[in-house]
Amino acid sequence: MMTSNILSRFLPPNGSPSVYETIRHHDATSDSSDVEERAGLTLEDGSGEHYSDRELEDAMTDAERSRLLDPDDAFIRRKSPRKASVAGPSKSNSRHRHSGRPRWAHDASPGHDFEDGDDDVPASLLVEGHHDDDDDDLKSRLPPPPTSHFTPDNRQTSLPGPSTRGDRARWRAAREQQPLHHADRRRAPAVRWSLGQPNLNTVDPKEKAMWMWANVENLDNFLKDVYTYFLGNGIWSILLNRVLSLLTFAFVIGFTTFLTNCIDYHKVRGSKTLNDILIEQCTTKMSLSSTFLLWLLTLFWIGKAFQCLLDIRRLKHMHDFYYYLLGVSDTDIQTISWQEVVSRLMTLRDANPATAGAVSARHRKFMGSQSKQRMDAHDIANRLMRKENYLIALINKDILDLTLPIPFLRNKQLFSQTLEWNINLCIMDYVFNEQGQVRTLFLKDTHRKALSEGLRRRFIFAGIMNIFVAPFIVVYFMMHYFFRYFNEYKKNPSQIGSRQYTPLAEWKFREFNELWHLFERRINMSYPFASRYVDQFPKDKTVQVAGFVAFVSGALASVLALASIVDPELFLGFEITHDRTVLFYLGVFGSVWAVARGLVPEETTVFDPEYALLEVINYTHYAPSHWKGRLHSDEVRREFAELYQMKIVIFLEEILSMIFTPFILWFNLPKCSDRLIDFFREFTVHVDGMGYLCSFAVFDFKKGTNVINQGDRREPARQDLRADYFSTKDGKMLASYYGFLDNYGANHRGSHPATRRQFHPPPAFPTLGSPPAGEMGTIGDRLDQTQTRHGLAGPFMGQQSVFGPSRYGPTGLGDHASPAPSILLDPHHQPSTSGFRGTSRAAAFPRYRSSRAHPPTSGTIADGDESPVATGGSDPSRPAANAAGASSAGGVGTSDSNLGDSWRMNLAEDVDDDNTEGGENVDAIAGGAGVLGLIQQLQRVNKDTRGRTAVGL
């Protein structure tokens, strides 16, 4: 009885279908894109059959066969349901259509049966003319199939007629009077584009690459292959990497087996040669568990090697795609930028009619989420990071409970590589289908309880599986880490204290739609600044002890080294302790001295942790709200140190995580099941041609930064709760928006080098060009300037920024880069010229203040709906930055002064902007003002300079 009660907690009740059966049934009966399904536009036959994305490809390939079969003939095929019914239901329901006819030419359902026994005119003559026009347009834009060196036999395809005898007779009479096809067209061979076509091996590689590009079924998987090929630096580098990985795995397993089973360690002390301690035929004397494990790992290695061989063909296809269609060779792929690859993909999309527009209007509904028209930089990033964007949002919104379920470690978060694998297995593979799309079942609240219960069981099952797999993984990782880093630590013992970001920190720092290589570049540039920040804090007690240990160990090592130099033959064999010679103690004291010396900072290091952390934040873009005003505190340092730990500690946590991961999967994550199901339902949006995406990853370029409604002021509490729930924390979305525009901005190929960030290593002390903390404003001012109630926060202001010229630069000057459209974004993704205006809620303490009042503008024409405050003067109740932005919003023309702040990424007030000078025309001033004009300009400059302070100059 007790056993049945326990099992009933994990098994579904009797008589109710499993959640997986419900998901499979829903996936089988629902279209991949449910926009048409929800709108009631899905085409169905009498049996309720749905269409798949493959049907569009069949429709396109059969258009070539229209040289033999007219659209009228396809219509006549649909007029014979009785003939199809005679063959039996087994053939009609078979998934393999031997007739070669696509389902879009299916038999008409009873609701659409136009056949009537009293009709005097053949059904083919009742077809409207627009079908011919539609298919003719399709055929005109379709590329020719790849040519072959041989021609198949010409065959005449019989044209099916109506089902009744009278209609068949009338049909023959109509054909005699008006033939539908010419004889030469009837004798033309019907070439069908298919992956199984044998003549593809003999075609030209370029035409074959173009054909494969035109027949891509899953655009997400194809773009992932393109990106993986880019990261792998070509086919030969990828193959070499995989071969070396296989050899590394084989060496670790083989060498570990040799060390544990083939050496008799009891004979080591008295033996002189290796043969004295070797065990003969050691593999036959291995234990049963060791033999089973060795065979299991051997089979795994063989499977990986076989998979590597199978991938050669796919890599060759990708090599041809890069070389022939994108014009990128294996030597150039190591130096070309991803932005250039995206640009060439967009050019290929526009140049290839089969992918750009060779789809008729009646077939576009089949495209679903595989539209190649939606393939600019934003769409490609969303496709590549469809799952990663959800995980970034889960980490940002703290949906996952990653704390250890241990009483004395409940405040410790654990997120290792092993736990990440389990999360992808339990959550992502559960929510996404085989095509990489979110299952529409998760978007309906009617199945919330069943889906949540299924997710909870997946967590528990994964925890059980980790118990059996963990011992093998622990042994492998320990041996691999030992073989890899022991020699490095032996040569340079100070590397033991080297640090790197934890896996949890990487997911916290990563932004939406930020590809891995761009994120890795940004994070790698932050390492020098992060190490400098950690070393900034005073460690007086540790420094004193480390200095003493370094002095003692260095003195002992120096004496032993000097004695060995005087008489090396005698002294190197001298035993200081039993069986411990001078050489042994030289290694010990030298290692201790190196470690202790590494803990002592340089004497010339200037202590300024606040400035050092600002430099780190400029790269990581991570600044929690509770850090405001506390960057100098030790609490912030400890919190940052948890994200930036020593490599040896990260490795130990990875090993321990294999023990603690089952407990997290059993006790913590099942409690988050309801929140996880709600998260995917509430933060998923559908984009036409793309499918379902994370709502945070769909940037509204037209609205820019003003994407959050300020709400009703009469209910501030309710507005804040709802806005906080549907927004990201710590300004993640705005930082992602800015970062994306900087990575894929206008002319990213280097025509404007001033917009590219130059990397400089951290100085030993703040440079003379950096203002002191007092002149830069307080930390609270900086946080208030960049953070708002709704989470619209950008990175901290500092002297340097990975976004090119700092938007919040210490001088307070605006970014005068041109708002030219990006060539990597389609027109509907181009940033709006009014997308960067400040929100209605400004900072409580503006960071940059001008000591003089802005004169009213006189040279601009304001819109009729603008208030007098926006067009002239200043209102003390409104922020100065918003007033400045509004004063230039109604200008006309295309000059800098008329564009105003709409395209600028600087949220601070521009003290030296041209608009503050009364809106004068620069061309009029520079072009022949005369002596009097120059005198007036000089007087104006002297008048303005008197009121300025040293801030911002």
UniProtKB/Swiss-Prot annotation:
Forms a homotrimer with a solvated central pore, which is connected laterally to the cytosol through the cavity within each protomer. Acts as a lipid scramblase that uses its central pore to function: the central pore opens laterally to accommodate lipid headgroups, thereby enabling lipid flipping and redistribution of lipids added to the outer leaflet of atg9-containing vesicles, thereby enabling growth into autophagosomes. Residues 22-39, 62-76, 104-114, 165-182 have a biased composition (Basic and acidic residues). It comes from Neosartorya fischeri (strain ATCC 1020 / DSM 3700 / CBS 544.65 / FGSC A1164 / JCM 1740 / NRRL 181 / WB 181). The chain crosses the membrane at residues 243-263, 292-312, 545-565, 581-601. Residues 1-242, 313-458, 480-544, 602-647, 669-953 are cytoplasmic. This is Autophagy-related protein 9. One of its GO terms (cellular component) is Golgi membrane. It holds the Pfam family ATG9. PANTHER family: APG9 AUTOPHAGY 9, AUTOPHAGY-RELATED PROTEIN 9. Its main location: membrane. Residues 459-479, 648-668 dip into the membrane without crossing it. Residues 93-103 have a biased composition (Basic residues). The keyword Phosphoprotein applies. Disulfide bonds: none annotated. It comes from the Eukaryota. InterPro entries: Autophagy-rel_prot_9. It is found in: Preautophagosomal structure membrane; Cytoplasmic vesicle membrane; Golgi apparatus membrane; Endoplasmic reticulum membrane. The gene is atg9.
